[in-house]
From Swiss-Prot:
One of its GO terms (cellular component) is cytoplasm. One of its GO terms (biological process) is histidyl-tRNA aminoacylation. Keywords: Aminoacyl-tRNA synthetase, ATP-binding, Cytoplasm, Ligase, Nucleotide-binding, Protein biosynthesis. It catalyses: tRNA(His) + L-histidine + ATP = L-histidyl-tRNA(His) + AMP + diphosphate + H(+). It comes from Streptococcus thermophilus (strain ATCC BAA-491 / LMD-9). This is Histidine--tRNA ligase.
Length: 426
């Protein structure tokens, strides 16, 4: 049997991983500007953490979760999304305590798992970065969090991303709309997909989220949830829109957007772009003011988003955005003869200790092959070290682009390599 990676997973190899690291670092620096700190939760959780919070009737729980019973007969699931584990951690670690500064702002970066049909930008193991803010009902929190994602896209140079916005209102608004949607969809029940016929009984808002053609036709003229917002919900949504306008963040109202998770209320949003004539959601989130209480904590407002790294990198590639990834070496040491092996190790280590990126030959190859490696590594400078250089304590350092050379002592290399580089830059 040929051993291969499981379907729907990928190996992120050197070169590609540098792009991932760059995007992750830009995200970290962006989140830090908004006073977010990193949180790391387990890759697997008790099944109930996900099923009860995400929703028993959602596709995630009914079709997509990787769940199993462990050797202690505990029902475990690999995490399919990031919010529920973070909320569980917030409650378990009592981050709601009065001595903890509010709002609590955290971000995460890590793998998520869903059993879906693999396609571009959507794998069974996918990587997500996300943020969660606990303790603020202020609509400014909604807008600040959306603005943070917007700033991240701008920093990365991504264009043609549209913010889709909607409100699910509070519980009363949602219940009123739920009944209106049932009244609208029931006469056309038989024309809905089998999944949506089930959703109509269990959670009719899910029908709006369906990707099936017959369901999309059915909901074209469905009532808008915005017509069922009570005064409190309408005020919150109006303030969110006004603040987005004040920050010059453009958006469109999308009344059919409900998000694929059951815990949202009030503001929900998605950032959507177009790839190969197909819409692609690259970031989505919203407000969830009951989830902390649902996990056994005190009444606590929450707002956050998740962003798929595979999708983000796909967009960067499709838009031709070249990431400023550092791929070159500061120096490559070509080694001639076994007598220079030990000294080559000393020199390359001392240069690394000074903060430079350095490599050397380990394979005893001919000098031409070593120079070719230096070119492949995009080495800025090359040092040729043989037994005669070891005896004299002096080497030539060559600028690999201009071919200019300087002669320096081992002491200069090991104590002040920066000065050596400056000599070659003149």
């Amino acid at each position: 049997m040929k051993l291969q990676k499981p379907k729907g997973t990928q190996d992120i190899l050197p070169g590609d991983s540098a792009k991932w690291q760059y995007v992750e670092n830009v995200a970290r620096e962006t989140f830090k500007k908004y006073n977010y700190g990193e949180i790391r939760t387990p890759m697997f959780e008790h099944y109930e953490v996900i099923s009860r919070s995400v929703g028993d009737t959602t596709d995630i729980v009914t079709k997509e979760m990787y769940d199993f019973h462990d050797k202690g007969d505990r029902h475990i699931t690999l995490r399919p999304e990031g919010t529920a584990p973070v909320v569980r951690s917030y409650v378990e670690n009592k981050l709601f305590a009065p001595e903890v500064q509010k709002p609590v702002k955290v971000y995460y970066i890590g793998s998520m798992f869903r059993y879906e049909r693999p396609q571009a930008g959507r794998l069974r193991e996918f990587h997500q970065l996300g943020v969660e803010c606990f303790g603020s009902k202020n609509p400014a929190t909604d807008v600040e969090t959306i603005a943070m994602a917007y700033q991240l896209f701008n920093t990365l140079g991504i264009k043609d991303v549209t913010l889709h916005l909607n409100s699910l209102g509070n519980t009363d608004s949602r219940l009123a709309y739920r009944q209106a949607l049932i009244d609208y969809l029931t006469p056309m029940r038989e024309s809905l997909s089998k999944d949506s016929q089930r959703r109509l009984e269990e959670n009719p808002l899910r029908v709006l989220d369906s990707k099936e053609k017959e369901d999309k036709v059915a909901v074209e003229n469905a009532p808008s949830i915005l017509d069922y917002l009570d005064e409190e919900s309408q005020t919150h949504f109006d303030e969110v829109r006004a603040m987005l306008d004040s920050l010059n963040i453009p958006y469109v109202i999308d009344t059919n957007m409900v998000r694929g998770l059951d815990y949202y209320n009030h503001t929900i949003f998605e950032f959507i772009t177009t790839i190969d004539k197909s819409e692609l959601t690259i970031c989505a989130g919203g407000r969830y003011d009951s989830l902390v209480e649902y996990f056994g904590g005190p009444e606590t407002a929450g707002f956050g988003f998740g962003l798929g790294l595979e999708r983000l990198l796909l967009v960067l590639d499709k838009q031709g955005i070249k990431l400023p990834v550092e791929e070159s070496l500061d120096v490559y040491i070509a080694v001639l003869g076994s007598g220079a092996n030990g000294k080559a190790l000393e020199l390359v280590q001392s240069i690394r200790y000074q903060g430079f990126k350095a490599e050397r030959d380990y394979l005893g190859r001919k000098i031409k092959a070593q120079f070719k490696s230096a070119d492949t590594f995009k080495a800025k400078t090359v040092i040729t070290l043989g037994e005669s250089e070891v005896e004299s304590g002096v080497v030539k350092v060559k600028n690999n682009a201009t071919r200019e050379e300087v002669t320096v002592s081992f002491e200069e290399l090991t104590t002040n390599f920066a000065t050596v580089l400056k000599q070659l830059e003149k």
